[in-house]
Amino acid sequence: MSINKNKNLSSIKNKKNQDVNSRQELIKVYAPDIFDSKLIGKTLIKKRNPADENSSVDNKIYQVSLADILGKEEFSSINFNFKSLKIFNNECFTKFHGLTLTRDKICSLIKKWHTLIEVEVNFKTKDGYFLKLFLIAQSKKPKNMKSKTVYINSSQKRALRRRITDIIIKEGINMDIKDFIHRIYSLKIYEKIEINCSKIFPIHQVNIRKIKVVENSTL
């Protein structure tokens, strides 16, 4: 009786015995110029084709906590997305691709008996980044208010959204992306919003929930 031997089994076995690391290489990943091209970590990628060194890093997104970049724990709720731009001598350089607030932070901002204000703003920075920004803020109890609830009526919410939108656009269009990001985590833009909106209704806990890059800089 003859036994048919599957020739594919031996080839599969040989493939399994190959060292996985032999098909990968370790590269260093650097933050964009916004953070002075600081080293943010290392990662394994597939070995590149010598004819096209950029093929293995095209469109790859790296998410990094701002706390790790700056070495300050108070910024652990902010995550940055960096997109791979080019690779040279096992060093990957990136560009800004967005910002998100952690889920835990967003949940901590939502309180009962208060009004949560959400604002969406579209604008273009001085150096050509077209951004979609999502901001949230919480109503704040006025000093002389005795009521337990701190609700904002519809007309006040519309006025607050207009005021916040105007502030963000005026700030954003006159800055490049580096200055605008620095303005965010220095909290100066939040302080400006709180002061200007207090004339309509007091707010606090102002935070940018998310930034999407709709169009990258062409400069």
From Swiss-Prot:
Q: Give one Pfam family, short name only.
A: Ribosomal_S3Ae
Which cysteine pairs are joined by S-S bonds?
none
> What are the recorded GO MF terms, alphabetically?
structural constituent of ribosome
Q: Which GO terms describe its cellular component?
A: cytosolic small ribosomal subunit
Protein keywords? Cytoplasm, Ribonucleoprotein, Ribosomal protein
Keyword Ribonucleoprotein listed:
yes
Task: Name the family.
Answer: Belongs to the eukaryotic ribosomal protein eS1 family.
The record describes its quaternary structure and partners as: Component of the small ribosomal subunit. Mature ribosomes consist of a small (40S) and a large (60S) subunit. The 40S subunit contains about 33 different proteins and 1 molecule of RNA (18S). The 60S subunit contains about 49 different proteins and 3 molecules of RNA (25S, 5.8S and 5S).
> What's the protein here called?
Small ribosomal subunit protein eS1
